[in-house]
């Protein structure tokens, strides 16, 4: 397990919980079997499964997959997202959310993933991606690029900051829970909305729509924090 995810694995579900807008957005695009790429502990997949959908999850982190299977009772496999072409099934919806896509470290790898998503989708199937809108960060002429709002509840506080690191962005987190405080860093590949749309088009996707969140807010390149994209294989 990577150091970053190992450090937050025990508190992951305290930090990140599904929300209704997210679930509704996915269910509106669900057509047949669903694949959750980078499913983590499987909370989102479980919500969809509880609503009657046939869902499979994959994640690179074995500890997450164990929780997805044993605690959230979903069909999950420990697998790199670049290996989805090895799955037997095709899908009506593939989604990769939670800024997971940008853990791939190059345009080439992201392009490879999108191509494999296209190949694994049924005709009229949908792909949903959600990452951070990196455009505002890339306009900052400083090593410190900014932060996202702190996640804070009765169980945990999760502080998120971003720093320039060559061609990458260093994602710095501090998680405080009970009697522990853990700081960690991981590099992210800051692909922009324009670059992502271009790759989707090159791989044959159509009906590409960009939003500023799962609430379908209009995407503002300069100000939107999330970037949500849906695309269809016609």
Residue spans of the language-model regions?
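Conserved class I S-adenosyl-L-methionine
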Residues: 1-32, 43
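Conserved S-adenosyl-L-methionine
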Residues: 38
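Class I SAM-dependent methyltransferase SAM/SAH-binding core
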Residues: 42-84
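A short acidic, Gly/Pro-enriched loop at the edge of an enzyme's catalytic core
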Residues: 85-93
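A short SAM/SAH-binding and catalytic strip from SAM-dependent methyltransferases
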Residues: 92-108
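A short glycine-rich, Lys/Arg-flanked "PGG" loop and its adjoining helix->strand segment in the class I
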Residues: 111-123
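SAM-dependent methyltransferase
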Residues: 128-199
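C-terminal lobe and adjacent flexible extensions of AdoMet/dcAdoMet transferase-like proteins
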Residues: 193-234
């Amino acid at each position: 397990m990577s150091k970053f995810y190992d450090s937050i694995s025990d508190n992951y579900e305290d930090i990140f919980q599904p929300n209704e807008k997210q679930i509704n957005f996915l269910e509106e695009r669900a057509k047949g079997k669903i694949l959750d790429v980078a499913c983590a502990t499987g909370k989102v997949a479980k919500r969809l499964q509880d609503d009657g959908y046939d869902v499979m999850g994959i994640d690179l982190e074995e500890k997450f997959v164990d929780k997805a299977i044993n605690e959230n009772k979903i069909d999950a496999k420990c697998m790199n997202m670049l290996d989805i072409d090895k799955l037997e099934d095709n899908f009506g919806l593939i989604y990769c959310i939670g800024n997971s896509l940008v853990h791939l470290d190059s345009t080439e790898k992201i392009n490879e993933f999108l191509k494999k998503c296209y190949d694994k989708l049924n005709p009229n199937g949908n792909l949903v991606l959600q990452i951070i809108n990196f455009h505002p960060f890339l306009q900052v002429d400083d090593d410190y690029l900014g932060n996202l709002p702190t996640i804070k509840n009765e169980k945990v506080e999760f502080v998120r900051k971003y720093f320039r690191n060559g061609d990458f962005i260093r994602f710095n987190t501090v998680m405080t829970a009970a009697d522990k405080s853990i700081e960690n860093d991981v590099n992210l590949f800051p692909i922009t909305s324009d670059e992502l749309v271009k790759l989707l088009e090159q791989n044959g996707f159509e009906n590409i729509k960009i939003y500023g969140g799962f609430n379908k807010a209009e995407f503002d390149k300069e100000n939107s924090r999330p970037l949500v994209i849906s695309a269809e294989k016609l």
